[in-house]
């Protein structure tokens, strides 16, 4: 099995994004399954185009997107992607989309194909905090999550896709105002979560 794991580049004035930093540290194989790592831009629509190109190139069986969720204290697999985006916060292009639906003919929401309960259990057993999230927000994370689900329905019916949010790194947190997690713990937790997903 081939698993494509993506991580976003830094955004919002940050110099680092734990998503791509953790993805880069993942092993090249997990339980004999090939791990393909990809950095994606924090840009509406462009992020989905980059991932689609990678799907067509590598033909993965599963795609897991990883993103930063500042304020969370655990690794959080997402349950559902919603057909809504807000352009109130500019992306890395300096712009944002018109507020509204991501895809005019898309479903209001798509549930992940990943075994998120098993993923949470496995991550906790590895000693890393984890819980299911029911909201991926309305920024580029949810946008990419939704677009991948939309592609699965219309173009890649055998593909399994999902999204995992991770906390800030300690270096991103000032005055201890937000939770954070070390990079080594993120990698440990993501590895356990991915292993549970591919072994389900």
From Swiss-Prot:
Q: What class of enzyme is it?
A: hydrolase
**InterPro entries recorded:** Peptidase_C15, Peptidase_C15-like, Peptidase_C15-like_sf, PGP-I_bact-type, PGPEP1_Cys_AS, PGPEP1_Glu_AS
Single Gene Ontology MF annotation: pyroglutamyl-peptidase activity
| Record EC number | 3.4.19.3
Record localization: Cytoplasm
**GO BP of this protein:** proteolysis
Q: Which domain of life is it from?
A: Bacteria
Keywords for this entry?
Cytoplasm, Hydrolase, Protease, Thiol protease
The question of whether Repeat is a record keyword is answered with: no
Q: Which PROSITE patterns match?
A: PYRASE_CYS, PYRASE_GLU
Gene3D superfamilies in UniProt? Peptidase C15, pyroglutamyl peptidase I-like
CDD domains, sorted = Peptidase_C15
From the UniProt record, list the reaction(s) this protein catalyses. Release of an N-terminal pyroglutamyl group from a polypeptide, the second amino acid generally not being Pro
A Pfam family hit: Peptidase_C15
Q: Which residues form the active site?
A: 78, 141, 165
GO CC annotation: what is one? cytosol
- What is the protein's major site of localization? cytoplasm
Write out the similarity annotation.
Belongs to the peptidase C15 family.
Assembly information from the UniProt record: Homotetramer.
Q: What is this protein's function?
A: Removes 5-oxoproline from various penultimate amino acid residues except L-proline.
Q: Mind telling me what this protein is named? A: Pyrrolidone-carboxylate peptidase
Q: Which organism is it from?
A: Lactobacillus acidophilus (strain ATCC 700396 / NCK56 / N2 / NCFM)
- Biological classification of the source: Bacteria, Bacillati, Bacillota, Bacilli, Lactobacillales
């Amino acid at each position: 099995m081939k698993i494509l794991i993506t991580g976003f580049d830094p955004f919002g004035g940050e110099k680092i994004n734990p998503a791509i930093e953790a993805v880069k540290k993942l092993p090249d194989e997990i339980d004999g399954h090939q791990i393909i790592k990809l950095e994606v831009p924090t840009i509406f629509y462009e992020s989905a185009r980059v991932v689609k190109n990678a799907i067509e190139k590598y033909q993965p069986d599963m795609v897991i997107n990883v993103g930063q969720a500042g304020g969370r204290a655990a690794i959080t697999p997402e349950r559902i992607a919603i057909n809504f985006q807000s352009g109130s916060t500019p992306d890395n292009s300096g712009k944002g989309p018109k507020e509204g639906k991501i895809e005019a003919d898309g479903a209001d929401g798509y549930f992940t194909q990943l075994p998120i309960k098993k993923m949470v259990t496995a991550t906790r057993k590895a000693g890393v905090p984890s819980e299911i999230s029911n909201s991926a927000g309305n920024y580029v994370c949810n946008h990419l999550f939704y677009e991948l689900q939309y592609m699965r329905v219309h173009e890649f019916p055998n593909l399994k896709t999902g999204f995992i949010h991770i906390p800030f790194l300690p270096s991103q947190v000032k005055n201890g105002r937000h939770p954070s997690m070390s990079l080594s713990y993120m990698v440990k937790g993501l590895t356990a979560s991915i292993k549970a997903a591919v072994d389900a």
